[in-house]
């Protein structure tokens, strides 16, 4: 945790992809042999109520506990590889770059945020992403799902889930009980999103969220919503999720929509796993979407876009607003260097990117939910 932060809180989330071979995809984007886990937030939530999101939540002091060092390997970063220096003109996301020692934790942020994402996945969805012993899993493919017979009886596991929800420190006790550790090595660093100033939830809630990607061989056998923060769960391929969003079956916030468009580049779980593993040590930068209000909608500008400010107002203290009387279509015709999400209404989103992706990452497919041409190029 970072108690020095005043304008947002730190969080972690995981894009959990599970193999689904032989499935049929009705999407015009084509077949896909894996599914993602989506959780529908409660309608009573103070932040993005009823939205379909990836598992995750706020980092807690227990995620940074020195006690984890008794379970995890003693190697530097608990066996995680060292992220390479950022490219020229780039920067390491502060979320990961912050030295946690002066903040009272010997556990690196790269480890603690993974523990947070794994703990939250158990709290919200009942899924345990654990590995045996205190060493990285051998093998280069997607991680195996923890078999049901290796878990505790359902009633006992449910009681542990309730305890962890009430006290995150109990997650370490659960791992000790099972003789397993959080499978931090299965989570690959993927992206980092900071809530825009003008899109804060009730009480001005903003989050600096680490997004990880985790590929599992098969869907876990024990998924269930908690009926507290989470009202329902859904397993869906990225193309199908976009179709559901387009038909207003589900609602996705812009970061989730963007990441789905990026995942639509991968129809194979093995290809996705290899890509995420190969580029994970490249790291990522923090993205703060900056909102430009147009006459008929909004444009969320992302780093690299020609209209993205040189000095973004990260805290909101400058009270800077960007607005124009021009229509979105006119702004698109006038521009040439794009990294943006166009928002006409809650179910009308379009991603436009024609810049080179940094950190050896993949640009999203440029998808406009108002168009049937999903692979549109500018």
Curated annotation (Swiss-Prot):
Fatty acyl-coenzyme A (CoA) diphosphatase that hydrolyzes fatty acyl-CoA to yield acyl-4'-phosphopantetheine and adenosine 3',5'-bisphosphate. Mediates the hydrolysis of a wide range of CoA esters, including choloyl-CoA and branched-chain fatty-acyl-CoA esters and at low substrate concentrations medium and long-chain fatty-acyl-CoA esters are the primary substrates. Highest activity seen with medium-chain acyl-CoA esters and higher rates of activity seen with the unsaturated acyl-CoA esters compared with the saturated esters. Exhibits decapping activity towards dpCoA-capped RNAs in vitro. The record marks 41, 47, 205 as: Important for coenzyme A binding. The keyword ATP-binding does not apply. InterPro entries: NUDIX_hydrolase-like_dom_sf, NUDIX_hydrolase_dom, NUDT19. Its main location: other. This is Acyl-coenzyme A diphosphatase NUDT19. Its EC number is 3.6.1.-, 3.6.1.77. It catalyses: an acyl-CoA + H2O = an acyl-4'-phosphopantetheine + adenosine 3',5'-bisphosphate + 2 H(+); CoA + H2O = (R)-4'-phosphopantetheine + adenosine 3',5'-bisphosphate + 2 H(+); hexanoyl-CoA + H2O = hexanoyl-4'-phosphopantetheine + adenosine 3',5'-bisphosphate + 2 H(+); octanoyl-CoA + H2O = S-octanoyl-4'-phosphopantetheine + adenosine 3',5'-bisphosphate + 2 H(+). It comes from Gallus gallus (Chicken). The gene is NUDT19. A motif (Microbody targeting signal) lies at residues 376-378. One of its GO terms (molecular function) is magnesium ion binding. A motif (Nudix box) lies at residues 105-126. Its cofactor is Mg(2+); Mn(2+).
